[in-house]
Design a protein with these regions (language model features):
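A structural signal for multi-pass alpha-helical bundles of membrane permease subunits
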Residues: 3-184
């Protein structure tokens, strides 16, 4: 192993092809897109230099600003939720759990390895759009909170938060394992 890591030819043999593929697939399109963003026109026809006019028009667009606001909320809530829940779970593993520690850690980490389609189907059933049909609405109804029964993913006021809960649940196990490893 040390022989390979000390050999610059061996390192180049592994790194250079990957860099070439990455440059062709990722970097070239990013640079082209950035270059084309300073022009107006149709591809193959007439192109005019627009400077920063395209960006000025973008930041005046209400739809773009709304999408940017929603994305910022999502990133903030999901990041804080995943890291915060992961930290709390890792502290629970270290200082509170005495029995069944391995089983609980496995169950908490399980959503990380679930396929995205399975998680989507699971939460589609939990947040079922028809009231009183999904798991969450049935639970709320049986506990007497009938005024909270609603289509969770079907309305703009609750859809973002429902998706945030799903993403936090999926990734908090990963962060809990990372933090738990740091606590050991």
């Amino acid at each position: 192993m040390n022989k390979v890591l000390g050999n610059k030819k061996a390192i180049s043999l592994f790194v250079v092809p990957a860099l070439i593929v990455y440059t062709i697939i990722v970097m070239v399109p990013v640079i082209w897109s950035l270059y084309y963003s300073f022009f107006s026109g149709s591809p193959g026809l007439q192109w005019e230099f627009a400077g920063f006019d395209n960006y000025a028009r973008l930041f005046r667009d209400k739809n773009f600003l709304n999408a940017l606001t929603v994305n910022c909320k999502y990133v903030l809530v999901v990041t804080v939720g995943q890291v915060g829940m992961g930290l709390l779970l890792s502290l629970m593993f270290k200082f509170w759990l005495r029995r069944c520690k391995t089983i609980v850690r496995t169950l908490v980490f399980f959503p990380v390895v679930l396929p995205t389609v399975a998680v989507g189907q699971l939460f589609a059933k939990i947040y079922e759009i028809q009231p009183n049909y999904g798991l969450l609405n049935s639970l709320l109804d049986s506990l007497g909170f009938t005024n909270l029964v609603q289509p969770w993913i079907g309305q703009s006021s609750t859809a973002l938060w429902a998706l945030c809960v799903m993403d936090i649940w999926v990734a908090m196990g990963f962060y809990s394992v990372i933090f738990y490893g740091a606590l050991l």
